[in-house]
Amino acid sequence: MDIMKGLYAAVLTSMLVLSGCLHEQSGIAETSTYEADDAAGSATSGTTDTLLRLRLSGRDSLSWTSTNIQLSVGDTVYRCSLSGADPCQISAQDGGDGNAWEPGESIFLRESGTDICTEPACTVVISVVYDGDQLTGDSKIIVD
């Protein structure tokens, strides 16, 4: 009987200790946000214009392998990547970790062989997704 009481007490203690570990943790996408601004240059009919600057806020870095950034102009969606193999290239400026977008770090999005914004006053819709979850931020910017 004493063995059963001891076992019962051990199970209850384990449940109490582990209960704090079992609740749902808030995701990085819920605690990270970004701000978007028009980049300094003007939109032209060229294919190498720097369009936007995005700055990450929050406490966590976003791994580039789990981060998906897309721009939309009209009905056309443009995927952005670090490699420049996509129509939109991500240029990381001031972070220390080349594998992640860090809080406080600004990145620039520029055309990479595709004319995304032909002329000034181009409306660009921005989507930043981390690990399948949409980040909160400026969703639409006018590029001049």
Range-by-range predicted roles:
Residues D75-S81, L135-G137:
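Surface-exposed loop/edge segments in extracytoplasmic proteins
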